Amino acid sequence: MGQIVGYDHAIVGAGLSGLLLAKALVDSSARATGGRPPATRVLLADPRPAGRLPVTFAHWVRRATALDAWTVGTWDRLAVVAHDGQTHRVALDGWTYTALRWDRARAALMAELAAHPRVTVVQAPVDAIRDGEASAAVRLAGSWETARWVYDSRPPVPVAAGTRGARRGVNLLQTFRGVWVQTQDEAIDTSAATLLDFSADDGPDLGFSYVLPVSPRLAMVMAVRMGEAADLPDPLPAVGRVTGGSAWEVVGEESGTTPLVVPGLSRRLGRRVLAIGRRGGRARPSTGYAVTRILADTAAIAASLDRHGHPMAVPPDPRWQQGLDAIWLRALIRERAALEPAFLALFTRAPVDAVLRFLDGGAGPLDIASVVRALPPGPFLRAAAEQAGATIRR
């Protein structure tokens, strides 16, 4: 007698990738059964309560997405500010830069899934995953639960440079701290979101701020730093450029740390286990952008299940893209002073379509050629030579 499998799908982690995938699975099953109760059984495990901390995501889109209900601001122009304060504005040519409140979205999606008759939500960590031939299992709260397919979205573990299994051997941290600022007067310019502002950062690592002006009296000012230290940057020096001399107060705060890691392992972690989200390399290693890639990956997994009966037929990232990510990260480490001109060049010398696809990881060869032509060659040639040497030594 065969083993009884408790679930069709077990999703480890209820972050962006886990929740979007869970919703896509039950929605797809409902469509397949013609509106009757779906047959798919989903287990969703995460130790974190819903909506615990405020989190705002920003990304660019061309069409409607499953996250639109939680949008708090949209812009069709971006601003890039140099260290000397000079501002460059860029029209997005059909793209829309969108800010969404992920804490609100997560709370709503968690509630929707928890109320679904075919979804089991468990607030507990998964401390082990066991692969198998016909099913896999996850261990949570001291017991094993079986599923036909397991999706692991737990945070990736950085692989130290030079160790066995390190494909590229480059790891950095992206730390960020932001404040929601409310002004007394209608003093905030909402015509463009500021993607990169280098004018208020003098730290040793690459640092900048970005601004999401959601109304004439309310904006998110976020300071970002990319380096090897985990210290949180200070967003307050950048507030003055946003408030225009008006009195202001902080009405909310956000902070966090994201590893910028070039993945060293296959997404297929076993016969029945697939890495998703950041663990599956869906955050662009060289930039940290993830939302657009996770939306696309969710659709690809659902399509693989529909067409092939398994979730593994998802397109891999090209090897040349992984190589570019490693070179970009090495340049961030070694060439901090040269990286500000590089970022500015992206938005002043390359087509915006190519730049946005490059930052999200969806660029093709022609996009890459446009980006490479726009960048100052010195820092990246030196980083490429160093990366090539590291690869040869391994």
Task: Pin down the residues of each PLM region.
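N-terminal Rossmann-like FAD-binding beta1-loop-alpha1 element of flavoenzymes
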Residues: G2-L43
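Short, well-ordered alpha-helices that flank and scaffold nucleotide-derived cofactor binding pockets
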Residues: K23, D27, R31, A111, ...
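Predominantly flavin-linked oxidoreductase catalytic cores and closely associated redox partners
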Residues: A24, E112-E249, L260-L265, R279
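N-terminal FAD cofactor-binding segment of flavoenzymes
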Residues: A24-S28, G35-G85, R104, R177
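A conserved beta-strand/loop capping segment in the N-terminal third of enzymes
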Residues: H59-S135
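FAD-binding beta-loop-beta segment adjacent to the flavin cofactor pocket
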Residues: D201-L206, G256-A275, G281, P285, ...
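Conserved mid-domain beta->alpha element of the FAD-binding
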Residues: P263-L329
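C-terminal helical "tail/cap" subdomain of flavin- and related membrane-associated enzymes
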Residues: A302-R394
